[in-house]
A protein has these predicted regions:
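Intrinsic-disorder/low-complexity signal
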Residues: 1-162, 166-172, 177
Length: 177
């Protein structure tokens, strides 16, 4: 059974799935349809072009050290080959995951103690976009061996719609932060 995460909540993935070695991080979203002006009233609603992006950042001793440790639409694979971004979806069209990151936990070099997954809206300031303008937004973690969804975080369930980024962190060992 998948755990539905709330802001600030922690979950032990190894406790949920012993021997976890491969995970899929999935990001999905749909633009909220909006009506603007006279023409929109004639032709119906139109979804805003909102581009959410998933990024994985590998940390050493909890710190960011090198730009090559960032895996995203502009750098699809980590130099170790253990973290791969499967491509950029610019619109959120379609069902299910719109972007995916695959992580082979068993082969991540020992010097990395954490992987932070960041979700942001591309060019959000220029486009004046925020999470309140999207619906059905989620990030989820799936056991790569069993395809079982382990946990899911609803990005649309926000107290504040003024946010344009969010993150999930995974650690090799328990952390107090």
């Amino acid at each position: 059974m998948s755990i539905s995460l709330k802001k600030g909540q922690k979950v032990s993935l190894t406790k949920e799935s012993a021997g976890l070695s491969n995970v899929l991080v999935g990001l999905g979203w749909d633009a909220v349809e909006s009506k603007k002006g006279f023409l929109a009233s004639l032709f119906g609603t139109q979804a805003a072009d909102i581009d959410c992006d998933a990024t994985a950042i590998l940390l050493k001793d909890g710190k960011f050290c090198d730009k090559n440790d960032v895996v995203y639409f502009g750098n699809l694979e980590h130099k170790s080959g253990t973290v791969r971004h499967m491509g950029d979806n610019l619109t959120g069209d379609g069902e299910g995951d719109d972007e995916q990151i695959l992580i082979d936990l068993s082969k991540v070099p020992a010097e990395y103690d954490r992987i932070v997954i960041v979700v942001n809206i591309y060019d959000c300031i220029k486009r004046k976009q925020e999470f309140g303008m999207i619906k059905n937004a989620f990030i989820r973690i799936v056991d790569g061996k069993t395809n079982r969804e382990m946990c899911k975080y609803d990005l649309s369930d926000r107290k504040s719609t003024r946010l344009n980024s969010s993150h999930v962190r995974t650690s090799r060992m328990p952390s107090s932060a």
